[in-house]
Design a protein with these regions (language model features):
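PLD/PLD-like phosphodiesterase catalytic module centered on the HKD motif
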Residues: 2-184, 199, 207-212, 226-307, ...
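Acidic/glycine-enriched edge-of-secondary-structure segments
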Residues: 170-192, 348-366
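A Trp-anchored, charged/polar loop motif used as the substrate-binding/catalytic surface
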Residues: 191-201, 363-377, 395-402
Length: 569
């Protein structure tokens, strides 16, 4: 029914509003009460959905339940018609999100009387198209799952699955074979759409016998990628980073180089680190049938695909392929900052995607065409909301940190942010509730019933995104993303890709990704603090005593939660 990226329910008889936001592989369902606060007997929302061309609705399930008669914790996940969602928004991952057509959502308010009996109010319903590609045939935003530290992973594969799914160290990655019986199912779940889309591009390149293929990689230790590249003999050229731990003969990157050098010939593969790192993650396919370019933050490694929060954008068509091919040629011709920064690749280039305002440029740049300050200035022009997920923000002082810290003082700006480490000067929770930052955490202590201990995913970075979403809810919405760390080194020393997209559909997708990560880790940060941690997590029944408060009370008195409730619905 609708190709819109935001759709609202239209039932005027319902006591609440409902708005659907399209994400990539997910949907954000947001609600708000129309007049004042809900009644005290309101205990949450039941959410159900129907797939395109389906004939039945499926209720979302809730891990939390009401306490039993004796106060016991129910360990079972129940339908939200029995265990309603006690939040004003929810990010849903449909089982078959790639299906074409309308996904129909029905949201129903749930009430509880003095006998603990449930009843249901007038529902809201709306339909939205999720489908696989953000802009079919032009641009696709993709994400990894990034949630090995989650209850969903533990439920599906067990808390001890990681050693059976991932190599103990990066250098052994090329020879590692998972031993978990359902490993392929697990890897597909962990890698999510980013993994499937990247592998699809390489498979299309293999099938198109006249396609030329170019890769620039940083981390590289995935056998499923190496085996595909070996099928591209005579058509593949490649650049592999040789900085730091990538340089020794024992590194996976050197092992891959040695194998491919023998196959491709020295003229077609090289090592490089520019001024510091060749930090790109770029694939380009130029053929009669397949024309695609892959950019973003997703490293071609076990951790990049299966542990970290990452994103990749798949660009389709002659124009983006030509631009990215030129960037490869410029990297191949210049190992130095001075040489590369003079090329057209080190400036903004319109991707020519027809109806999508999207530009790309590549690092390293000179001081004259550096972009970090202008990005910081643009962040400073935020008028409504800022969402960011920035790895290494804690160790990159400069325009980006300065701009975000300045926004903390502005009560009119709503912001959620994620970094891989806490950032000095950016608070996890501000008294005014407007700007909040979280970092990755797993449930390993202070476990609340009915939750189980979660794996860490091994040592190293878990949150690896590099994106900023400015004013997603305005016509001026824009997204910066890429391999670019929003640091001085990324700007003028490293090899990097950076995109600027002024497009609301894309901005909404990245906003939802930021929200789902923020929610995931905010709860875990609270539980890690013994003073704040809850021993049990259960749904709240209506207030029965004068001192008791309804579950939604905070959503109407906490400044951040008020803004959250109003912004998304």
């Amino acid at each position: 029914m609708s190709d819109q990226f935001e759709v609202s329910g239209t039932n005027t008889a319902a006591l609440f509003t409902m708005k659907l936001h399209r994400g990539d592989g997910m949907a954000l369902v947001a609600m708000n009460w129309k007049k004042g606060k809900p009644p005290q007997d309101f205990v949450g929302f039941a959410i159900e959905y129907k797939e395109p061309n389906g004939d039945k609705f499926f209720a979302l399930k809730n891990r939390l339940a009401f306490a039993g008669m004796d106060g016991s914790v129910n360990p079972n996940q129940l339908s939200t018609r029995l265990s309603p969602i006690q939040k004003f928004r929810w990010v849903h991952f449909p089982r078959n999100a790639e299906l074409a057509g309308d996904f129909t959502y029905t949201v129903t308010p749930v009430f509880m009387n003095a006998k603990d009996e449930l009843s249901y109010g007038e529902p809201q319903q709306a339909a939205i198209q999720l489908r696989r590609e953000t802009y079919p045939g032009k641009l696709n935003v993709t994400f990894t799952r990034g949630f090995v530290s989650s209850q969903a992973f533990v439920d599906k594969y067990g808390a001890d699955a990681i050693p059976k799914l991932l190599p103990a160290n990066a250098d052994g990655g090329l020879d590692f074979v998972p031993t978990l019986p359902n490993a392929q199912d697990a890897l597909a779940w962990m890698g999510f759409e980013a993994r499937s889309a990247i592998l699809e591009v390489l498979d299309q390149a293999i099938a198109d016998k006249n396609a030329r293929v170019r890769l620039v990689v940083y981390d590289f230790n995935l056998p499923e990628l190496l085996s595909r590249l070996k099928q591209l003999k005579g058509r593949l050229k490649m650049i592999i980073d040789d900085s730091g731990t990538h340089k020794p003969k024992t590194s996976a990157e050197t092992q891959a180089f040695d194998q491919l050098n023998t196959l491709l010939g020295a003229a077609n593969i090289k090592r490089q680190h520019m001024g510091n790192l060749q930090h790109n993650k770029m694939i380009v396919v130029d053929g009669p049938k397949a024309q695609a370019a892959v950019v973003g933050s997703t490293n071609h490694s076990w951790r990049g695909f299966y542990v970290q929060n990452n994103n990749a954008i798949i660009l389709r068509g002659k124009s983006p392929v030509k631009i990215c091919m030129q960037a490869f040629d410029d990297y191949q011709a210049h190992d130095d900052v001075a040489g590369f920064s003079k090329t057209t690749s080190a400036n903004w280039n319109d991707l020519g995607l027809g109806g999508i305002d999207a530009r790309i440029d590549f690092s390293p740049r000179s001081a004259k065409n550096a972009v970090l300050k202008t990005i910081g200035d643009d962040v400073g022009k935020t008028t409504s909301s800022l969402f960011f997920s920035l790895a290494f923000l804690y160790q990159t002082p400069g325009p980006m940190q300065d701009a975000i810290k300045k926004l903390q003082a502005d009560d009119q700006i709503f912001s959620y942010g994620i970094s891989d480490h806490p950032v000095k000067g950016l608070d996890v929770a501000k008294p005014n509730g407007k700007v909040v930052l979280v970092s990755p955490k797993e449930l390993s202590k202070n476990l609340p019933q009915p939750f189980k201990a979660e794996p860490t995913g091994g040592g190293g970075v878990r949150m690896h995104h590099k994106f900023v979403v400015i004013d997603f809810d305005k016509p001026t919405a824009r997204v910066y993303m890429g391999s670019f760390n929003f640091s001085g080194a990324a700007d003028t020393s490293n090899g990097e890709n950076l995109l600027l997209m002024r497009d609301r559909r894309i901005a909404v997708s990245y906003m939802i990704e930021a929200v789902r990560i923020f929610d995931h880790y905010e709860f875990r940060i609270v539980q890690a603090d013994a003073k704040q941690a809850k021993k049990t997590l259960q749904l709240k029944k209506p207030p029965r005593k004068p001192a008791e408060k309804a579950w939604f009370e905070e959503d109407y008195v906490n400044a951040r939660k008020i803004r959250d409730r109003e912004l998304f619905s």
